[in-house]
Amino acid sequence: MFKIIDDVKNEPTLEEAQKFVGGYVEGITFPNGDYLIVNEEGKLQNLPLNVEATNLWRSTFTKDKYMIGYDDFVVGPAILIKKAALKEWAA
């Protein structure tokens, strides 16, 4: 599952995000300001590959720009909050 939030009125609470990803949340800020929320322990729990979120990750963190992380992958449900929709999750 991959959910994209592009309106601040749809921004999830912490509890809603935890329920969606199935556990503790980990947030990653993308260079463009978008914010990805994943299950912090997803890889330890052997959650299935999230192809959509992984494709987004790899198209953003490319080898020519980043020394580490470009070949990483996302597992389990994920939420992408677009920069314009960030309020409570804004860093």
Where are these regions (language model features)?
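Detector for the mature cores of small, proteolytically processed
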Residues: M1-A91
